Amino acid sequence: MDKSLLLELPILLCCFRALSGSLSMRNDAVNEIVAVKNNFPVIEIVQCRMCHLQFPGEKCSRGRGICTATTEEACMVGRMFKRDGNPWLTFMGCLKNCADVKGIRWSVYLVNFRCCRSHDLCNEDL
């Protein structure tokens, strides 16, 4: 395992946040839970599964828990693959301005992000 790449993972997430589009501004944001209260639409909060490090075939090894996504956030699953397509690492949690993205190149890895707001712990199903 390349520890220097693991230490750079937060930098990758920060760069991704700066480049991604906002979930709430997307035209196809159909997974948001919207309730109408007193004739005003209200976006409900969503709880997300959180895990900072999970390797293939193993349980979550760091950062297991639940986070609460604000109206600007979504539940997210990030998966890193080696260039040959073999899975290397999975991480999940709440992410601001989340967007579904495939194939971001990061060193010798490819990274995919999937986002949801359809129900509590929806990122367990992605």
Swiss-Prot record:
InterPro entries named in the record: LY6_UPA_recep-like
Keywords: Disulfide bond, Secreted, Signal
Ranges for domain UPAR/Ly6: 46-125
Disulphide linkage map: C48-C75, C51-C60, C67-C94, C98-C115
Transmembrane segments: none
Domain of life: Eukaryota
UniProt family annotation: Belongs to the PATE family.
Annotated GO MF terms: acetylcholine receptor regulator activity
A Pfam family this chain is assigned to: UPAR_LY6
Secretion signal span: 1-21
Organismal lineage: Eukaryota, Metazoa, Chordata, Craniata, Vertebrata
Principal location: secreted
Tissue and organ expression note: Expressed specifically in prostate cancer, normal prostate, and testis. Expressed in the epithelial cells of the prostate cancer and normal prostate tissues.
GO cellular component: extracellular region
Subcellular location: Secreted
Protein known as: Prostate and testis expressed protein 1
